[in-house]
Regions:
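Proline-centered helix-kink/hinge sites
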Residues: 17, 105-106, 125, 153
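Mobile active-site "lid"/loop adjacent to the S-adenosyl-L-methionine
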Residues: 107-138
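A secondary-structure boundary/capping signal
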Residues: 11-12, 85, 161
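Class I S-adenosylmethionine-dependent transferase superfamily signal
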Residues: 50, 120, 143-147
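Conserved Class I SAM-dependent methyltransferase catalytic core
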Residues: 133-171
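Conserved SAM/SAH cofactor-binding pocket of Class I
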Residues: 23-115, 142, 164
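Conserved donor sugar-nucleotide recognition element shared by glycan-biosynthetic enzymes
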Residues: 17, 67, 136, 140
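Conserved AdoMet
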Residues: 1-30
Length: 171
């Protein structure tokens, strides 16, 4: 599939990159940063685009080893160097210090599953899409708490969010 002028392989272990994510990359590329971390990298689309368009050191984390294999292949095919790390962010207490953290974590509520198009459910991993209704901000809260200690001074967080929880996510 195409993303930000790149050719990427996707499969049932990765989300299919969407235009909203390209817009997120546009915003990030306006920033000055030396080191960036993508949490929940999936196909690697975000860190690959960042590595292709900057000289920054780029790291990427995912809980899925299968997704990381695809991300590594995509990085190689697009001739960029990224440090991929197999890690469950919810079980993590330390990260490398970076200037920028980006994440498109699971944010669709389990109760919204029936509203999701069948082609999404058929071809994309539920692990990357859905979050429990009782704790919809779990990933944002964890990443924000890690950012306190592992974002460099003047560092920034970039998230894709569920519009339903926009205000709560900001808080």
């Amino acid at each position: 599939t195409g993303f930000y002028g790149l050719k990427l392989k996707v499969n049932e272990h990765t989300l299919i990159p969407r235009p909203d994510t390209e817009q997120l990359v546009d915003w990030i590329l306006k920033e000055n940063f030396v080191a960036a971390l993508d949490i929940g990298t999936g196909s690697g689309c975000i860190p690959i685009a960042l590595a292709k368009h900057t000289d920054a050191k780029v790291l990427a984390i995912d809980v899925s080893e299968d997704a990381l294999l695809i991300a590594e292949e995509n990085a190689k095919n697009n001739e960029v160097e990224i440090d991929f790390i197999h890690q469950d962010i919810l079980q993590t207490n330390s990260l490398q210090k970076v200037d920028l953290i980006v994440s498109n974590p699971p944010y669709v509520l389990e109760s919204e599953k029936e509203k999701i198009q069948e082609n999404v459910l058929d071809y994309e991993p539920e692990l990357a899409l859905f979050v429990e209704d009782k704790n919809p901000l779990i990933f944002y809260k964890k990443i924000a708490s890690l950012a306190i200690n592992f974002l460099n001074e003047n560092g920034k967080l970039f998230f894709e969010i569920n519009a339903k929880f926009g205000k709560e996510t900001i808080e």
